[in-house]
Amino acid sequence: MSEELKSLIQPHIDSFDFFTDHGIDLVLKDSEPLYFEHNSTQYKIRFTDLKLSRPTRNIVEKEIKLYPNESRETGTTYNAPFKGAIGLYEVNEMDEMDDGTEVDYNKQEPTHTFEVDLGRLPIMVKSRYCHLNGMSPEKLIESREEELEQGGYFIVNGNEKVVRMLVMTKANHPVALHRKAWTNRGPGYTKNGITIRCVRPDRSSITNNLHYINDGQTTLRFLYRRQEFFLPATLLLKALKDTTEKEIYENIVQGDNENTFLTDRVELSLREQKINNINTQEEVLDYIGSRFRARTQFPPSFSNIKIGRWFINQFVFVHLPNYNDKYNLLILMIQKLYAMVGGKCGTDNIDSPAFQEVLLAGHIYGMILKEKLTEYLESTKSFVLKSFEDKKKSGDKLPDALKKVLDKNFKIADRFSYFLATGNLRSSSGIDLQQTSGFCVIADKLNFLRFISHFRSIHRGAFFATMKTTAIRKLMPESWGFFCPVHTPDGAPCGLLNHLSSNCLVTVDAAQDPTVQKAQTLLPSFLAAHGMLPIDMVSVYQHQYLTITLDGRVLGKIEPKAGEEMVKMLRYLRSMGNEPSIPKTMEISYAPPTNVENGQYSGISLFTTGARFMRPVVNLTSGQNELIGPQEQLYMEIAVVPHEVIKGVTTHIETSPTAMFSLLANLTPFSDYNQSPRNMYQCQMAKQTMGTPLHSYPFRTDNKLYKVQNVQKPIVHTKNQFKFRCNDYPHGCNAVIAVISNTGYDMEDAMIINKSAYERGFGHGSVYKNEYIDLDQGLSRFEQKKTFFGRPNTVVDELDKFIDTDGLPFVGRLIKPGEPYYTYIRPSDGRQVTKDYKGKEEAYIEDVRIIFGPNGATRDPSKINNICVKLRFNRNPVIGDKFSSRHGQKGVLSQLWPEINMPFTESGMKPDVIINPNAFPSRMTIGMLVEILAGKAGAIHGKFQDATAFQFDENNTAIDFFGEQLAKAGFNRFGNEQMYSGTTGKEFECEIFFGVCYYQRLRHMVKDKYQVRALGKVNALTRQPIKGRKVGGGIRFGEMERDSLLAHGASFCLNDRLMKSSDFAKIKVCKLCGSTLTIYSKKDYSNQTVSECKSCKSSDSIATISIPYVFTYLVAELAAVNITMKLQVS
């Protein structure tokens, strides 16, 4: 098992394991009860238990293990039973404590408990709850999986679906921003604000915004049921702590009394709150509770103070349960906001990875579950109350009514299946996300590299794709080593869809790592012992002191010089990994004090949460590998290569200069010799290559699978080719290549292939397609489950050549369009019905699968009604098929040239591929020239060549290194050879560049795309040919094509294309009034058809003209809006 390969997909599996092992329990613990009244008694209901099993299927009343491949082959979902329990409680006095202590529901016994079936929850392959977890490669092959199966995806309706990673704002970190939209929040609101995304232990989050108002006041905004609410910050400070105005003033100003900008605003904010005459904490909580009471579902017995506390617990800094911590964080945010407005610090860049983390599959699962549990209870409550309004059922007892309702309620797990199948999120609250669609994609198994790339891709979000600004797409310096600078698509998603670099890790949640949990408790006392002044010791510090925060909790203050020393010590201890207070995955972000305008707000921020980016570098002090985060990287001195190290300045060095690239970008040979866009194109084309997506072809029922028959390992490869086991899934062939302009068939990037090389198998491929045939589809309910495959008329139907005696097609047979495909017995009259093959091209029947019912009860061979047929289509190269080298040099096959006419070298070698030398100068893909050289040397000496980037430089050149190898074998050191014409046998005047290059065959093939039609379907409205290759449509003759014919003056050709071959029509028109709408045909006394103009009352002035039919449609549409159009007919 490849550990490196496993690490690429690990974040997905870790997040799902967090959901199953901890997330479900945390969601249950944090889920809110729902209150309602019945017979003047207050009740509440809440979930008391949630239980997830492992995937099983039911066979004749017996549960047996369900393996992923069964779900793939049968087109079903890989899921497990999900059950829960709901408790009904009577609300008593114990619920009404106002002192802020949380009610422990687990100690309260429910009066009734109801077991509920919540459906079947889709399970991630190879997660802890999957049967493949921990299997050896041999066992995986026995289970019909790949030897290198890594999992990380879900199987829904037979398709492999990936929940794509999304960029989120960094958890629990206050970010200073300018947002123009904030000025619309109300009168006096400015564009200045601080935003913080507070994440609870169960990974659900709430975003709090602190706004700056023109007069110097600040307000905190949060969302509740998609509605915005604002709280004045000074009011909230009093609600969080029983304190005085003097203490609040001192906490914010921190002894900086000469800063009148700050002191004036703080005084004004405090004076404004005096007007309300609310002073104590209890009074403030009562005031907040009374304002919000109408919005909540709480019973009247609940006091305002309790409701006020509930609002603060649920919506204000939810990551901090302690009110004192909430108070200190709000003070810090107010200080940062005033510093930004006063010009002491600048805004933070939300587009930089320093202020970003990632949203993973398991975390979004937890968010959805939390919301669906609430929705489940709300629908239960409304149905129960409705049932008591019904006079027939009003006599039912509450537990009986509740049980009836719970049996009919929706299945929570079905919402997850819908989410994975469509990628759409149906949410009442929006769960603090900026999008509702595009969460899931199908994990294409086009080739191995494309499949792996799905797990490393990270999207900025659907909302940003619609934005016109380009700032969000820019490559930030902070993303070095975390996001790949090369691997992003060209076109619309450029810069929005990035890929993690091959060394980038995503941290696991603290709940999954006991060392992190332990460190979180030990760290405050460790820091206090090393120079930090705890925040609660004194209220006034010098304003120059730095604030130390841990995961959004203010721990204390430190003097700036001591702070710098502390950071060095913490990083050293982190690299050594032997101090229990400092976990290896802790990010130590240090922004030093600066006098520069718009610098970063100074402070030390420590992060131990999950879902953050980290990457390894070598700490020069300890000599050990150390994990660093994007926010701390900004102020670190890291050398890329050893000779860049400056003594006394450089503290770290990169593990490798290629560590900044993604897996795919690292596979491009000699990428440092190429122009950057070509490396980008190669990253895209590697993902479109036909290759070896998997080895378990017989057990796969994917909609479409590609396969190239003669694949090889590349002679020239990078270190990652071995490291990530890419040679187990090769996707190309080492071709002998000549760079020569030979026949004229190689113009414009076209390439000539040696016909004999083609006949030997160069580029030969196949496409596998699977077709599900379900006889119950489209039948009435009466006929379903009564229609079966069969062929009773075997003696007389003359179908022995096509169909077997069971009514199914023969495996291995070549089937052509229109030939009999299968037969079945119609239940209404018991007659045999033959269905023909409707495909457009001939195919081989690779295999036929029989799919039994979900319960597996109908295993009778005579009662088969659902099959899956795998068809194999031949896809050998034809003229127009696309090929490419590994340097973005794409071209189409222009001619299969006979070998006897191919140019040859002195040694008798003939090229497999000829390309034009004009492909190189403008594109500057020197890497390809070096590869041809290295490939030639490798082939001659029989050894693989290392083409990892940045290993050659000006002093030690690649040309010398590989040229030496060629010279030793007796070849020209620059790769040129004397060649002779294949047609005349004469020697070419110049030497030809000749060598070996790895070529890929791309999936864009003429057989899949060619489109031709003479006559066919037309649009009913316009009578023009319809579009679409599948439905037999035509190719559009568009505006540009029209313009070129106009420019050529080819009017007859234009007439033919746009009228005769399109919507030619003969229309009657009145010469007098020029109308085409008022002509009316009738029969005269001799039964002859006569046309007459209704407006002119004349039948003599009617003429017939030829015009496109769509013109009459235009005239009718204009007439509908009271515009008449007249023609002048001579």
Swiss-Prot record:
A zinc finger (C4-type) spans 1070-1096. PROSITE patterns: RNA_POL_BETA. It catalyses: RNA(n) + a ribonucleoside 5'-triphosphate = RNA(n+1) + diphosphate. GO terms for biological process: transcription by RNA polymerase I. InterPro entries: DNA-dir_RNA_pol_su2 (IPR015712), DNA-dir_RNAP_su2_dom (IPR007120), DNA-dir_RNAP_su2_hyb_sf (IPR037033), RNA_pol_bsu_CS (IPR007121), RNA_pol_bsu_protrusion (IPR007644), RNA_pol_Rpb2_2 (IPR007642), RNA_pol_Rpb2_2_sf (IPR037034), RNA_pol_Rpb2_3 (IPR007645). It is an enzyme of class 2 (transferase). Its EC number is 2.7.7.6. GO terms for molecular function: DNA binding; DNA-directed RNA polymerase activity; ribonucleoside binding; zinc ion binding. It holds the Pfam family RNA_pol_Rpa2_4. Its main location: nucleus. SUPFAM superfamilies: beta and beta-prime subunits of DNA dependent RNA-polymerase (SSF64484). It is found in: Nucleus, Nucleolus. Keywords: DNA-directed RNA polymerase, Metal-binding, Nucleotidyltransferase, Nucleus, Phosphoprotein, Transcription, Transferase, Zinc, Zinc-finger. One of its GO terms (cellular component) is RNA polymerase I complex. Component of the RNA polymerase I (Pol I) complex consisting of 14 subunits. Belongs to the RNA polymerase beta chain family. Three distinct zinc-containing RNA polymerases are found in eukaryotic nuclei: polymerase I for the ribosomal RNA precursor, polymerase II for the mRNA precursor, and polymerase III for 5S and tRNA genes. DNA-dependent RNA polymerase catalyzes the transcription of DNA into RNA using the four ribonucleoside triphosphates as substrates. Second largest core component of RNA polymerase I which synthesizes ribosomal RNA precursors. Proposed to contribute to the polymerase catalytic activity and forms the polymerase active center together with the largest subunit. Pol I is composed of mobile elements and RPA2 is part of the core element with the central large cleft and probably a clamp element that moves to open and close the cleft. This is DNA-directed RNA polymerase I subunit rpa2. The gene is polr1b.
